[in-house]
Amino acid sequence: MSVALFCGPPPAVSFGCKDGRGRKGMVRSKDIVRQTVKPPAHACRLIGWNKYPGSVVPTNSSLSPSPTALDDEIELDPSPFLIIYKDGRIERLKGTTVIPACPEVATKDVIIDPATGVSVRLYLPNVVDLPSKKLPVLVYFHGGGFVIENTGSPNYHNYLTLLAAKSGLLIVSVNYRLAPEHPIPASFDDCMAGFNWVVSHSAGPAPEPWLARHGDLTQILISGDSAGGTVTHYVLLRADAGVIEGAALVHPYFLGSKRLENQTEEDFEFHEKLWRLSTPDTEGLDDPLINPLAPGAPSLAGLKCKRAVVFVAELDFLVERGRMYYDALVKSGWGGEAELVHQKGVGHVFHLSDYSGDVSVDMMAKMVAFLRGE
């Protein structure tokens, strides 16, 4: 079975870049798609994020605003991720392109919960030569700040295809619901459901034949990047003991109410607002869901895995939070083996867009070695 990274060009889609006052003068790009969906009614009222009230409406009070003008009024502007209009539409600016599952490289999509629409994408490496071999299973959670990306995003599809080919693991990538339409903890709940769905194949009838035939359910690992790294920590606290062999947290999206020295005020404020948009009922950046080191957060000694590795990038806004997490884990009394991989000269999730650079190749080698237990 050959493993191809690209199954064909992404679909031709378009996206409009805002000029600060609606969609006037927008440019088109084939790489991004406009999604118009309705968020919860309260989501747009919570934070004053670059509001432009009425700026596209005629100033002459005798004129009635046109429907087009009203449609284009911006309520919140957390670009470059998304724009929320006053009529409730959400326009995602990135992370929406979907590459279809590729039968040529043994990938497929499976809906695991028809009620919520939560699905998984499975990546089965070359088993034609070893049809009876059972493979370790990696459950993966994608990033995107909880508001963008999906299992079919080109970066994730191509990266996980490559990872499956190099590691020889059967990978299950969870396609969870996004905020603000589905406020947190929906994404956390969906990922936990995806993990439990995989584990369920170890007892009783197995609904997914790939996992039943090729998955070694005694060797389950989990991983995620950015927001997916945050979810990885969440799952580690809630899984049954003895189920997870190892966990890899890649540039985990951990925040906190205190701005660190390496974090600019602009970046800090952006991520605070993004978290509040995603989590309307949050108490702030010391919510244990986003800050595992906050007062009252569950002890890291309770992580349910034997091995853990934390990847951090020198130029990443989140680098110090990742290092702090690793240090706290080592000091927590947790009984597993912990490793920190600090890579220099690169930024947040650099490895998803550059597969051939020296640092990316080194990171892939370290990830594969960890997953294999080498």
UniProtKB/Swiss-Prot annotation:
Pfam families (alphabetical): Abhydrolase_3
InterPro entries according to UniProt: AB_hydrolase_3, AB_hydrolase_fold, Carboxylest/Gibb_receptor
Catalytic residues as annotated in Swiss-Prot or TrEMBL: 226, 316, 348
Keyword Mitochondrion belongs to the record: no
Principal location class: plastid
Tagged with keyword Hydrolase: no
E.C. numbers: 4.2.99.22
GO cellular component: amyloplast
BP GO annotations: defense response
Subcellular location: Plastid, Amyloplast
UniProt catalytic activity: 6-tuliposide A = tulipalin A + D-glucose
Transit peptide: 1-68
Recorded family membership: Belongs to the AB hydrolase superfamily.
Stored PANTHER family: ARYLACETAMIDE DEACETYLASE (PTHR23024), CARBOXYLESTERASE 2-RELATED (PTHR23024:SF577)
Role description: Lactone-forming carboxylesterases, specifically catalyzing intramolecular transesterification, but not hydrolysis. Involved in the biosynthesis of tulipalins, defensive chemicals that show antimicrobial activities against a broad range of strains of bacteria and fungi. Substrates are 6-tuliposide A > 6-tuliposide B.
Note: 6-tuliposide A and tuliposide A-converting enzyme, which are compartmentalized in the vacuoles and plastids respectively, come into contact with each other for the enzyme reaction releasing toxic tulipalin A upon cell disruption by pathogen infection or herbivore predation.
Protein's UniProt name: Probable tuliposide A-converting enzyme b6, amyloplastic
Organism: Tulipa gesneriana
